[in-house]
């Protein structure tokens, strides 16, 4: 086994010949430990350490697990239960599962076992919730009453919601509103991921493509409804190239036949389209159906 970290600097993939390939997802300095993860990096500390203990038989003490804020991401942070406080509850010692949680603002404490039970109950609710926009939005609103908006349970629901927005079958008048929500959600997910797992992870590549299609749809809508000039449209489309090129670079490292490699084909098509629009100085509008 490679050394474990919940914010690893490598990622592996297994190809059709069952060869496991490990690659760096960010620069690894000389002498720096090379690490991998054995649990979902998009889970909170309580869940990750519980799973690692049960399945891999060790107590993780990595930098992320030891930090109550999870590297500043607040991936585990709760909201204070004292009415009108508005403070954040952090675990006093994340490496001790029964450790109490304390509010940074008022100092109120909550028993660690109570927090564990509460989170497990909400994990079950998130898992069981219907994958429909109204149900997921209602669940997200409820979670944000108890957890920091960056908490992994909120992130999980956002991952569920984002693909539901703007799908075929949505009412025409809802498409723009849903696209705006989707773009904002993708941005929030990418920002939080950059804190807990910085680097070229496949999940980042997939999200960058998802956000690109949404941004492209919104820009096209602005042009068609005369909310922007052609020159502004072209300039804004040009700004989409860098993140899309990053996605192509990330997904290009995934094995053939994988979901990510299929997404790569789409990303390359979108990249060529962006280049064509910019090169033609906005004279050619986007082909139909590219949203």
Could you say what each language-model-derived stretch is?
Residues 4-143, 149:
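C-terminal SET catalytic tail plus cysteine-rich post-SET Zn-binding segment of SAM-dependent SET-domain
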Residues 232-255:
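TPR/TPR-like (Sel1-like) alpha-helical repeat modules
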Residues 167-183, 221-238:
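Acidic, serine/threonine/proline-rich low-complexity intrinsically disordered regions
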Residues 213, 248-291:
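Eukaryote-biased recognition of C-terminal alpha-helical segments
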Residues 115-141, 150-171, 202-223, 265-277:
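Amphipathic alpha-helical repeat scaffolds of TPR domains
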Residues 127-139, 175-188, 236-244:
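Helix-turn-helix repeat elements of alpha-solenoid scaffolds
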Residues 144-158, 172-176, 194-205, 230, ...:
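Helix N-cap/loop-to-helix boundary motif
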Residues 140-145, 163, 184-194, 245-252:
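Amphipathic alpha-helical segments of tetratricopeptide repeats
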């Amino acid at each position: 086994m490679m050394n474990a970290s919940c914010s690893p600097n490598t990622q592996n993939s297994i190809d059709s010949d069952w060869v496991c390939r490990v690659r760096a997802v960010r620069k690894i300095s000389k002498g720096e430990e090379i690490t991998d993860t054995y649990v979902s990096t998009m889970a909170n500390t309580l869940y990750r350490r519980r799973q690692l203990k049960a399945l891999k038989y060790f107590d993780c003490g990595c930098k992320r697990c030891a930090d109550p804020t999870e590297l500043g991401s607040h991936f585990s942070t709760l909201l204070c239960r004292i009415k009108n406080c508005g403070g954040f509850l952090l675990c006093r010692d994340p490496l001790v599962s029964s450790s109490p949680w304390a509010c940074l603002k008022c100092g109120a404490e909550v028993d660690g076992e109570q927090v564990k039970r509460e989170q497990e109950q909400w994990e079950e609710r998130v898992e069981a919730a219907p994958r429909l926009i109204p149900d997921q939005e209602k669940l997200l609103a409820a979670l944000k009453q108890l957890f920091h908006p960056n908490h992994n349970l909120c992130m999980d629901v956002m991952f569920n919601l984002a693909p539901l927005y703007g799908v075929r079958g949505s009412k025409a008048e809802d498409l723009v509103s849903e696209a705006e929500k989707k773009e904002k959600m993708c941005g929030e997910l990418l920002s939080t991921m950059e804190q807990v797992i910085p680097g070229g992870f496949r999940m980042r590549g997939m999200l960058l493509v998802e956000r690109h299609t949404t941004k492209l749809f919104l820009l096209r809508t602005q042009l068609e409804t005369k909310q922007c000039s052609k020159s502004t449209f072209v300039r804004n489309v040009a700004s989409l190239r860098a993140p899309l090129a990053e996605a192509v670079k990330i997904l290009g490292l995934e094995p053939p036949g994988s979901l990510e490699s299929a997404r790569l084909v789409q990303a390359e098509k979108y990249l060529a389209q962006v280049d064509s629009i910019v090169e033609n100085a906005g004279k050619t509008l986007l082909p139909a159906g590219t949203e």
